[in-house]
């Protein structure tokens, strides 16, 4: 068996299948590596075995060796423990970002290099370019499927060793390629949601690890209107799952989460979807990561996303002495959520990003006791 030049992360999905197929057409020695990131907990909801069988089948069709590695321990300590800690603190984390940084482009990359590979390839919708002496992370050609948001924590050494073979494809084209190539995953449904939760009920799953504590749901004036099953089950702007029935003297309209007081275990809601309590013009981040190793300048203009698939929002970024950033948006943003990722762009190029620490949304700022000043950025 020849040493593979490239190890492909085969997930059992159609995207990684076509990534492997494209590389196979080039004639270089390749191998597939399937990684298991979550141990079967006996719930019957784990899709890992089905995905592994599909990955084996794809490798068979393409005539490339199949390898398996169990990273469930690394995932638990590097991703899941952080996920639980963030929810316990009342924040809403993004485990996919951390998984890419801590597992897929760290432990997986190490495993591939141990097999003798020079580079790895994955089925992400993103692109890499080398310009100005630095590796650049670019959006995928399919804007609806672009995954650069989840890859913004990657650095130079990782990008230098990574290929994104499907980054220049539209999803519809990719499906057609998979069908014409006879890949067994060509009609497989895309996976959605948090990988380790799958199709399970989110509250039931989270309740296994974080004991729920019921508390009051209040309106912005502090009047009690209902009871919640646990404050960490909810995120800013959320409508579903509140189970607020008819409230005397209130319109029969939906309610939206506008604030969480973790210390008092109180959830605040409003019937205005675009409530002023959800609006923010500024945010403060934790320490930022820059794909090229440094920010473009101490202060610069660019666009930002504060959640996946959000339209680009023009903003001004001020880099702080501690490595964090403060961001001023040109227009108010709805439900910017601490714990989620701020990702910055210059056109198609992903500059980097950071975890959102605080915003100037009125209620969240009051509940957090934040010292963040909206006057910092003019």
From Swiss-Prot:
GO CC term, one of those recorded: cytoplasm
Subcellular location: Cytoplasm
Broad class of where this protein is predominantly found: cytoplasm
Location of the region described as Interaction with target base in tRNA in the Swiss-Prot/TrEMBL record: 94-96
Residues with site note (Interaction with tRNA): 124, 340
E.C. numbers: 2.8.1.13
InterPro entries per record: MnmA-like (IPR004506), MnmA-like_C (IPR046885), MnmA-like_central (IPR046884), MnmA-like_central_sf (IPR023382), Rossmann-like_a/b/a_fold (IPR014729)
This protein's UniProt keywords: ATP-binding, Cytoplasm, Disulfide bond, Nucleotide-binding, RNA-binding, Transferase, tRNA processing, tRNA-binding
Keyword Disulfide bond: yes
Region Interaction with tRNA, annotated ranges: 145-147, 307-308
HAMAP family assigned: tRNA_thiouridyl_MnmA (MF_00144)
Protein name from the UniProt record: tRNA-specific 2-thiouridylase MnmA
């Amino acid at each position: 068996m020849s040493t593979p030049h490239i190890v492909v992360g085969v997930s059992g999905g159609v995207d990684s299948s076509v990534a492997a197929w494209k590389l196979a057409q080039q004639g270089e020695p390749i191998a597939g590596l399937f990684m298991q990131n979550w141990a079967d907990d006996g719930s019957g909801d784990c899709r890992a075995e089905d995905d592994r069988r599909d990955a084996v089948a794809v490798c068979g069709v393409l005539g490339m060796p199949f390898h398996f590695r169990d990273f469930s321990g690394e995932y638990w300590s590097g991703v899941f423990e952080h996920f639980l800690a963030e929810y316990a603190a009342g924040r809403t984390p993004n485990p996919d970002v951390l998984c890419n940084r801590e597992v897929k482009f760290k432990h997986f990359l190490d495993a591939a290099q141990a097999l003798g590979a020079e580079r790895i390839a994955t089925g992400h919708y993103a692109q890499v370019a080398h310009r100005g002496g630095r590796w650049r992370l670019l959006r995928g050609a399919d804007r609806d499927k672009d995954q650069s948001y989840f890859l913004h924590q990657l650095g130079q050494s990782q990008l230098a060793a990574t290929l994104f073979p499907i980054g220049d494809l539209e999803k519809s084209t990719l499906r057609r390629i998979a069908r014409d190539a006879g890949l067994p995953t060509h009609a497989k449904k895309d996976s959605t949601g948090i990988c380790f939760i799958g199709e399970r009920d989110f509250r039931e799953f989270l309740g296994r690890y974080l004991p729920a504590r019921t508390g009051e749901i209040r309106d912005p004036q502090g009047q009690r209107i209902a009871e919640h099953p646990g404050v960490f089950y909810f995120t800013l702007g959320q409508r579903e799952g509140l189970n607020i029935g008819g409230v005397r003297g209130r319109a029969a309209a939906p309610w939206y989460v506008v604030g969480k007081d973790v210390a008092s275990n109180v959830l605040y809601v409003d019937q205005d979807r675009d409530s002023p309590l959800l609006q923010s013009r500024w945010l403060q981040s934790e320490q930022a990561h820059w794909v090229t190793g440094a920010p473009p300048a101490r202060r610069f203009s660019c666009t930002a996303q504060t959640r996946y698939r959000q339209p680009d929002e023009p903003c001004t970024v001020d880099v702080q002495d501690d490595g964090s950033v403060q961001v001023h948006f040109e227009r108010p943003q709805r439900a910017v959520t601490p714990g989620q990722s701020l990702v910055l762009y210059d056109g198609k190029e992903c500059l980097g990003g950071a975890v959102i620490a605080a915003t100037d949304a009125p209620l969240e700022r009051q509940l957090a006791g934040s010292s963040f000043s909206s006057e910092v950025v003019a």
